[in-house]
């Protein structure tokens, strides 16, 4: 089901708005859970990808845990009925207030991103006599072969504890009685479509985990984060990502220990394809360079990815007909970066036409 099937009804609505294919979402979740289940893997939903209440309800119905990166996300997960025992709290800069709230909810684990954060969580847990469960987020220095703005696991990154600091982190744990390590956590980037990257990543994880084994440290949980990409160029060609290939290469490459649980934090791959941003053409014009421009009522305030890192989304006309020609599709914000596409191929665009921006269900 796509927005195109409901063009007549959609023309009567105020724009812009998001259109969600809830059946595609349900099918995507079912496929992800089934493929992960073949190997006993646990999937958490990265709430930052989309926290629309209907989306979150579908996630809970599918039985996924939740990955949060703010105190408000932890609160939303709790209020949405997610058990605290299935919530992990990541985020490179957690505030004291957020940490205290998550401690009070007794969430499953904090993914800790610096040596100083370990000390802060220990001190805040000690205030109420609690012991916080933590996983060390380790930066493995792996090239994810994706856009630099969504690469999060290379050496020159703000994310995680450098693998060269692992020894120091473990020594510090001996003097922090109010935290208990339950595992290690990674996340190397987003929109990764080359499966070889995940294989190389798992090889690095194996080496890091072996170091822990040699230190006599038992890791009950391995959290590999997420990163699986989707087909922005051809949303109809493969609407459900390759979960079989993704979990399969991890299973073939990752060396788990007996009794160990492997976790994933998926966001984009679960929800992106199910969402479209429907917008109306307000004006058309041609600039001095001869470029045809369609000015629409949606902007970077509704979908920031194209402005933030020149992300591509396929744009289609729901109402136009005829031969395709290139258009710049731009929003109303007073920023030159408020452009969804510089050369979207569309039939002749007229004032009042409805356009739909595909694969917009994540990170709008």
Question: What function would you assign to each model-found segment?
Answer:
Residues 141-284, 346:
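Active-site loop/helix belt of alpha/beta enzymes
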Residues 3-4, 249, 259-364:
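Charged (often Lys/Glu-rich) extended helix/loop segments that serve as interaction or gating elements
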Residues 46, 133-139, 185-187, 223-225, ...:
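Short beta-strand segments
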Residues 1-132, 171, 175-180, 207-217, ...:
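A charged N-terminal "starter" segment
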Residues 44, 133, 221, 261, ...:
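Hydrophobic "anchor" residues on beta-strands that sit immediately upstream
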Residues 47-51, 72-73, 93, 114-116, ...:
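Active-site-proximal loop/turn and secondary-structure-junction residues that shape catalytic pockets
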């Amino acid at each position: 089901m796509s927005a195109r099937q409901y063009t007549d009804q959609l023309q009567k609505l105020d724009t812009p708005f998001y259109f969600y294919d809830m059946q595609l979402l349900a099918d995507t979740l079912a496929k992800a859970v089934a493929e992960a289940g073949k190997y006993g893997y646990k999937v958490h939903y990265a709430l930052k990808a989309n926290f629309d209440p209907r989306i979150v309800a579908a996630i809970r119905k599918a039985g996924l845990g939740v990955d949060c990166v703010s105190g408000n996300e932890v609160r939303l997960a709790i209020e949405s009925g997610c058990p605290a025992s299935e919530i992990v709290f990541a985020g490179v800069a957690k505030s004291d207030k957020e940490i205290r709230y998550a401690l009070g909810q007794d969430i499953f684990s904090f993914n800790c991103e610096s040596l100083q954060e370990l000390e802060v969580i220990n001190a805040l847990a000690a205030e109420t006599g609690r012991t916080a469960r933590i996983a060390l987020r380790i930066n493995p220095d792996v090239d994810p072969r994706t856009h630099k703005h969504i690469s999060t696991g290379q050496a020159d990154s703000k994310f995680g504890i450098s693998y060269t600091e692992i020894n120091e982190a473990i020594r510090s744990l001996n003097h922090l009685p109010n935290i208990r390590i339950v595992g290690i956590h990674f996340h190397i980037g987003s929109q990764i479509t080359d499966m070889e990257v995940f294989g190389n990543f798992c090889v690095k994880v194996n080496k890091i985990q072996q170091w822990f084994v040699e230190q006599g440290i038992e890791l009950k949980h391995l959290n590999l984060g997420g990163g699986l990409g989707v087909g922005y160029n051809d949303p109809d060609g493969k609407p459900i990502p390759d979960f079989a290939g993704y979990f399969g290469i991890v299973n073939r490459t990752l060396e788990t220990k007996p009794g160990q649980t492997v976790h994933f934090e998926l966001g984009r791959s679960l929800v992106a394809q199910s969402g479209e941003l429907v917008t109306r053409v307000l004006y058309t014009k041609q600039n001095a360079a001869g470029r045809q421009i369609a000015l629409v009522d949606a902007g970077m305030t509704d979908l920031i990815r194209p402005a933030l890192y020149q992300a591509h989304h396929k744009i289609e006309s729901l109402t136009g007909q005829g031969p395709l020609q290139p258009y710049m599709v731009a929003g109303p914000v007073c920023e030159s970066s408020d452009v969804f596409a510089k050369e979207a191929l569309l039939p002749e665009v007229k004032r009042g036409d409805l356009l739909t921006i595909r694969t917009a269900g994540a990170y709008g």
